[in-house]
Amino acid sequence: MMLKMGAMFVLLLLFILPSSQQEGDVQARKTHLKSGFYGTLAMSTRGCSGTCRRHRDGKCRGTCECSGYSYCRCGDAHHFYRGCTCTC
């Protein structure tokens, strides 16, 4: 009798653990997508132009102008593109 109850308990655990792990994976995926979206949103280059470039000291400098945005800066580009860019 105790052996049957022990076997039932093990089977129950085998079904519960994978389903809870899948729920955690879904939540992690949602968080990753949300952070990627806001990172791209903050790095808008629409309407930006200027003379932003990397100097010999490795820092990005130059003038930037953005149409429709109150703040514009020259800085390192997104990690997909190595270089400098104007961002609003």
From Swiss-Prot:
The keyword Signal applies. It comes from the Eukaryota. Residues 22-46 form a propeptide. Transmembrane segments: none annotated. Keywords: Disulfide bond, Neurotoxin, Secreted, Signal, Toxin. GO terms for molecular function: toxin activity. GO terms for cellular component: extracellular region. The keyword Secreted applies. It is found in: Secreted. Expressed by the venom duct. Contains 5 disulfide bonds. Residues 1-21 form the signal peptide. The cysteine framework is VIII (C-C-C-C-C-C-C-C-C-C). Belongs to the conotoxin S superfamily. This is Conotoxin Ca8.3. It comes from Conus caracteristicus.
